[in-house]
Structure formats: structure tokens, C-alpha cells
Amino acid sequence: MRAVIVAVGVAFLVSLFCTPIAIKVFTRLKAGQPIRAEGPVMHQGKKGTPTMGGVVFILATVIAYVAGHLALTTLPDAQIAQVEPTITALVLLGLMVFSGAVGFIDDFLKVRKRHSGGLNKRGKLLGQILVGAVFGVIALYFPSTMTDSQGTLTNTETVGSTTLSFIRDIPALELTKVGAVVLFIFVVMAATNGVNLTDGLDGLATGASVMVLAAYALIAFWQYRHWCADPNYTQEYCYAVRDPLEVALIAGAAAGACVGFLWWNTSPARIFMGDTGALGLGGLIAGMAMSTRTILLLPIIGGLFVIITMSVVIQIISFRTTGKRVFRMSPLQHHFELAGWSEVNIVVRFWIIAGIGVAIALGLFYSEFLARVG
């Protein structure tokens, strides 16, 4: 627990104090956000606001992970915990960094061309598929070799699973390894695009991501305290996962980094996370769902992202089939802007929706545990 607290604190402070430096640097480099002409008129005042701020909280998360491990070295946890970095950390941080890199290319092209159109859809899609495939393979093909003090193998789990999961793996829904990789690619694409579509108002995606990541930190730490690698817990209710403390540490660090960034990203935003941050967060959230065996729980935890994504899908289908639009504009937050809601009202109300989704998901997770314990 101490390592997680250290990681959260370090991530928050690094993000809080480095974001204003990034604002100055990106302003000097004229790395301002282009605004699409067909967007809400009130957004034209945001033109030129520094973008690519996701670089800050991605770096803050990586730095905090290292700090958390240093804390784990000097203040060992009473339970089973691997002090050295793990494949799990490689997968989760890799998903965040390389998904963020795809977004960075998109942001860079937007800034360079002074136009809201950056990386084309095919290029972004290929980038997401490549990242999902590479880390999906790593997650499935490298089992843990964790041993106890006597050298006995205590954990052989992989980061991901070939079984579809809700709160745990569902044995009846077994996939092949190829099928599991394809599923994970889909989850990466869905999560990255969900966060990206939500990132349309000051602080909206950042605040929602804080809640989702905090939820995953709680889930992973609970799994760590009831881990099948610990002989004190029975197979009836323990969690068959790999390196849950690592997952909790990274989720907590990312949540802390986002809180620090939110100080500067809240309305009126001094900096935007850009596709760098949105895709980075989406990639990490997808990894969290995979590593905690909660893939089918993700649509509830990230309920706001799902609602906003579905508003775009509904708008497209309606327009192509009937020639009519269901919403004044999509994604959904812009519909309410054009309906006269203030930006702050929309953001706070959407945060409430995000919080409700997180609360329901955590309730389901804990209820399942209680049902097993009896």
C-alpha cells in the first residue's frame, strides 16, 4: 500500500509542477490546438491553446512507477510482492506510451499543418492495431515464474487471458490465443477512441479518466490482498491474476498524474491533453481491463466513454440511413452545448454520470466477492 501511495503522490506532484513548464514550452513552439471550423462557435476562442499535454502525465506515470518501486525496495510490503519490474508493468506502461505515441503523431501533424485534421483515419487505425497486437501477444505468451522463498513456483499466470472475463475469467467463454489477441486489439481501439471522443470539453476526459483509473487501482489492490499466489487464500475466492500490486501502482500513478494535470486542464483550460493523452489513457485503461480480468466490466466502469461513443455511432447510422440527425452535433457533449448548456455544467454533469458507472462497477465487483465468501 505504501508503494501505491508514494506513486500517487509523486505522479501528482510531477504532473502539477511540470504542466506549467509544458504550457510555456508548447506556447513558445506554437504547438497550439487547431479548432475545426464546423465545431461549436464558442470553441473558436480555444484556438491556439497548447496541446499534447498528455506527454506530461504519461511521463509522470512512468516516473511515479519507478518511485513506487524504489519505495517497495526500501519499505517492503508484508504480503507477496515482486520488487523488480515485471512484464505486467512493461505491458501496461507500453500500452500507455505507444498508444500515446500514435496520438502524438496525430497532434504533431495537426500543429504542423495548422489544421484540425492530423493523422488520417487509416494511419491512426493501423497504429492502434499494431500497439494492441504487439502488447496483446506479450500479455499472452509470457507466464509468470514467481517463486516463494523455497523456490516453489507460486504463480504461472500471464498478464492477459484467453478466456473472456467479467469480474473473473468465464470458463465457458474460452478463446484461442489468436482470438484473444484480436479481442484485445478491439478493446484497445474501443478504449482509445472512447477517451478521444470524450476529450471535447475542458477537463471532461481528464476527470472521467481519474475516476476510471482510481477504480482500477482499488480493484487491483483488492485482488492483491486476495491473490491466489498467497497460500493464505483459498481457490474459491482468490483472484487468478498476475502482479496485481503492479497494476494497482500504475493505475494509482496514472490517476494521480491526471489529477495534477486537471489543475491546468479545467475550464478555462490552459493546456489540452491532445490525442497524445487521450490515446495514451485509452491504451492504459484497456490494459487495466485485460490484466484485472474485467473486460466485460469495462463498459460499466467506463460508462461515460461508451455513452459518448454510442452517440457518434447513432448519429452516423441515422444520417446515412434516413438523412436526419438525432443530435444537434456529436459527440454528445456538443449537442448539449448547442442546446444552451454551459461548458462547466456539461462537464460536471457528465462527471456525475462517469461516477455512477464507476460506483455500479465497483459494487458489482465487491458483490461477486461477497457471494463467493458467503
Curated annotation (Swiss-Prot):
It catalyses: UDP-N-acetyl-alpha-D-muramoyl-L-alanyl-gamma-D-glutamyl-meso-2,6-diaminopimeloyl-D-alanyl-D-alanine + di-trans,octa-cis-undecaprenyl phosphate = di-trans,octa-cis-undecaprenyl diphospho-N-acetyl-alpha-D-muramoyl-L-alanyl-D-glutamyl-meso-2,6-diaminopimeloyl-D-alanyl-D-alanine + UMP. It is found in: Cell membrane. Its cofactor is Mg(2+). Pathway: Cell wall biogenesis; peptidoglycan biosynthesis. The chain crosses the membrane at residues 3-23, 52-72, 85-105, 125-145, 170-190, 201-221, 244-264, 271-291, 294-314, 350-370. It holds the Pfam family MraY_sig1. InterPro entries: Glycosyl_transferase_4, PNAcMuramoyl-5peptid_Trfase, PNAcMuramoyl-5peptid_Trfase_CS. Its EC number is 2.7.8.13. One of its GO terms (molecular function) is phospho-N-acetylmuramoyl-pentapeptide-transferase activity. Its main location: membrane. GO terms for biological process: cell division; cell wall organization; peptidoglycan biosynthetic process; regulation of cell shape. It is a multi-pass membrane protein. GO terms for cellular component: plasma membrane. Disulfide bonds: none annotated. This is Phospho-N-acetylmuramoyl-pentapeptide-transferase. It comes from Salinispora tropica (strain ATCC BAA-916 / DSM 44818 / JCM 13857 / NBRC 105044 / CNB-440). The gene is mraY.
